[in-house]
């Protein structure tokens, strides 16, 4: 068996417009795929450098037949490297993103903050400290 050739995290979004404002508008993801190709997307892929993120619209139906959301807590968090954690938190707060952890220098040499995306997924923002 050959090793996997690619791993792409996928998130569910209740409002694709709000998800795009967060991931494309503020964090700078580049839309590289949309389905359907015209009109309002139900799925899209964004590229961040060499990494890709899939976002699917919550529809109530899944291919696997399981709920799209956990009963409580969270099952995934994203870690996104940015140039300026503080400026990014200000911009995301400006579009209504809740801040779970204000920017703070970490002992391992990074400045980090946590915000929630429009669907409550935790997003860790990191940059080199100092």
Residue map of PLM features:
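Short acidic-aromatic low-complexity motifs
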Residues: 13-17
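Conserved active-site tyrosine of GNAT-family acetyltransferases
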Residues: 19-24, 92, 120
